[in-house]
Amino acid sequence: MKKLLLLVPLVFTAPVHASEVTVGQVCKAASAAMFGRDHKIMQLDKVESGIAYVHYIRQNDGTRWAIKCKLVGDQVMWASDNPDSIGRWRDDPADSTVKYAIDGKKIIITELYSDGSSTTNSYPLKQLK
């Protein structure tokens, strides 16, 4: 009697526990937190070379406000990106520090101020698409 040896490749898969979060989603959440606006009005214009460009229209006067941001570790680096005032990257020690974290299906944005105080806001990932 001949024996047949069957070789079956084993494939191991690991479940994905963390959500895939884009720089655009983080930038929209950070903009809402920093400027005290509803995250639902934040619009992602584009992502180019790891930099997200986001804007919103201010309701009371219809003006357009825009920023660009990039992620450096858990920090959100940002600069204004308005046609008449393209600003500097907020990386001076006197600037507030904006950090992000992912908690399940939420993005948590924490802004740490130079006086030691901070504010924290949470946004549902699915509303930042």
Predicted regions and their residues:
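C-terminal partner/receptor-binding element of secreted or periplasmic proteins
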Residues: A94-K129
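A cross-taxa feature marking solvent-exposed loop/turn segments within ectodomains of secreted
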Residues: R37, G62, G116-S118
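Mature extracytoplasmic domains of secretory-pathway proteins
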Residues: E48-W89
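N-terminal signal peptide c-region/cleavage motif recognized by signal peptidases
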Residues: T13-P15
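Sec-dependent N-terminal signal peptides
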Residues: L6-V8
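Short, exposed beta-strand/loop patches in secreted or surface proteins that constitute
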Residues: I41-V47, K68-K70, T97-I102
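Short, non-transmembrane alpha-helical segments in secretory-pathway proteins
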Residues: S19-I41
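Positively charged n-region of N-terminal signal peptides that target proteins for export
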Residues: M1-L4
